[in-house]
Amino acid sequence: MIGTARAAADVALRTAPGMMAVFVLVMLVEAMTPIAIAWLTKLVVDDLAGGGPVAELVPLAAALAVTGVLIAVLPQVSHYLGNQMARAFTARTTAQLFTATLRFAGLKPFEDPDFHDRLRLAQSSLQSGQSIVAGSFGTIRSSITLLGMVGSLLVISPVLTGIVLLTGVPALAAQLRLSRRRASLMWEIGPTERRQMFYGSLLGTVEAAKEIRLFNSGRFFRGRMMAELQNANAAHRRMDLRELAIEGALTLMGAAVAGGGLVWAVIAARSGALSVGDVSLLIAAVAAVQGALHNLVSGIAALHQDLIMFGHYVAVTRAGSDLPVPADPRQLPRLSHGIEFSDVWFRYSDRHPWILRGVDLFIPAGRAVAIVGLNGAGKSTLVKLLCRFYDPQRGSITWDGVDIRLVRPEDLRHRLTGLFQDHMTYDMSAADNVSIGFVAARDDRERIRAAARRAGIDDKLASLPRGYDTLLTRMFFEEDEADDPEIGVQLSGGQWQRTALARAMFRGYRDLMILDEPSAGLDPEAEADVHARTRNQREGATSVLISHRLNTVRDADHIVVLEQGAIVESGTHDELMTARGRYARLFNLQAQGYVEPPQAVVS
């Protein structure tokens, strides 16, 4: 926890050192004002009761007035400075947090529910980091006020002072326990809140709107969402009841001490042991000590909770890459021989079954290799390993003899381009959706259009209301722009497929092109067109094709059939058809769908 506090302080000092110095000064003066108010009030009351000269009373009254102004103004100043520091702190920590997520070169963290919970808590703790800094100074301010008022109270009654201070011990212990419980509660209800947000997002997204209305499942999802919300609320309610019981008991204890002190002071003043000013000072001092003690205890507890929460941020930002890279990484040569999988075994964790089992595969340079198989055969996983989104548990993948684990992942991916079946549809302009494939050339509009032409989508994008500057979404319009068709448009699934293909082509020539179901979701005419365009694009280049439609891979130089994570057949289309094995059976099964009426399935 000390390391977490140091991390927060380091960020704060680097963010706004000058503003922090002013903030500290204001808070120190603010801490002294209650002490000054109490003593000046005592002196004024005693002077009035004793009938002292006006010449002595006026300066005291003026000082009391100035202090009153300060006690009214300084909180506003510190609030302003605190807000400015908080914004600067949040901006810096947000940048650092998402810089850290970019250090994860693979996909493992993003497919881990625990990491999603930690990342969510890290994002919510960005404000906690600033609270740690402000809370630390607030604790110092409360300590100064407490010490000053304790000194004042000691002058009147050491016994009462001791009793008031002793009430802070159980309060501190109770608040620390509550802070730990609050922090652990945030982690415990993380999955519940994720499910609640999931169901809520379904009810508000256009992607799910069609099915929800067709299947009349809206009430079902709403019920699921509300059930998760109620579970989270129940957990919070139990926490609130615990806080109510503990803080109520502490408040009653403090009130009893203050009431007892007041009774004693009145009796002492009646007997002449205390002056009227002493009574006023005691009343102010007891209230101030209890207030400062409460603020101190609450501040320490809040600081403790914030430190626990900010620990999630520190954990994410200090985490190393999920893919190991040697201290002296190898340079990747231009692909001239080929890529080789040697006895590759892979599973997502020790709790999962093997996805790939002893795969031996050679992808010759300048050739097209197709990978086919049923769903779950391991095709997409093989591509993930090829892109080094994961490392195999056994075996190796070499690029012209160089193990890709000895190469920086970004250097490997610089040599790749591709189109994934689950490609992204960015809520950005048409130009951005293409140029995101190679952001270094995002301002080259002619290159963008050339890539779109090769993908067969240039005419469509150019004809949009604002051409390539048209937003491909309706998410960001203002209220008065809701009916303006020029603000944003929605592309069809096939048009998005071509836009994603243009994104891959925008990268220019790369050593390896990966095409994962490049014609999925297209009509027959569009499928034939995209197939011809991708064939021209990969002519003479090394490429890997994945498709369920075997007619689109028959012209590949080499076809590999995966089944249950292992290669069961390989060869050219003609060789595999002659062998009359699994490939031939699947190919003929698909072909029959075009020439013979489908047979009824009897269950």
Predicted feature residues:
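An intracellular "coupling" helix at the cytosolic face of ABC transporter transmembrane type-1 domains
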Residues: L13-R14, L121-I132, P191, G204, ...
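Cytosolic ends of transmembrane helices, especially the final helix of ABC transmembrane type-1 domains
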Residues: S217, A285-R318
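Membrane-integrated ABC transporters
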Residues: M1-P34, V54-L60, E111-L147, R195, ...
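ABC ATPase nucleotide-binding domain helical subdomain, centered on the C-loop/LSGGQ "ABC signature"
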Residues: S396-T398, A431-P485, G540
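C-terminal portion of ABC ATPase nucleotide-binding domains
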Residues: R466-D469, A532, G540, L545-S603
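Transmembrane helix-loop-helix hairpins at lipid-water interfaces of multipass membrane proteins
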Residues: P17-L74, V150-R182, A256-I267, S271-G277
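ABC-fold ATPase nucleotide-binding domain signature/coupling loops
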Residues: L119, D458-T499, M505, D511-L515, ...
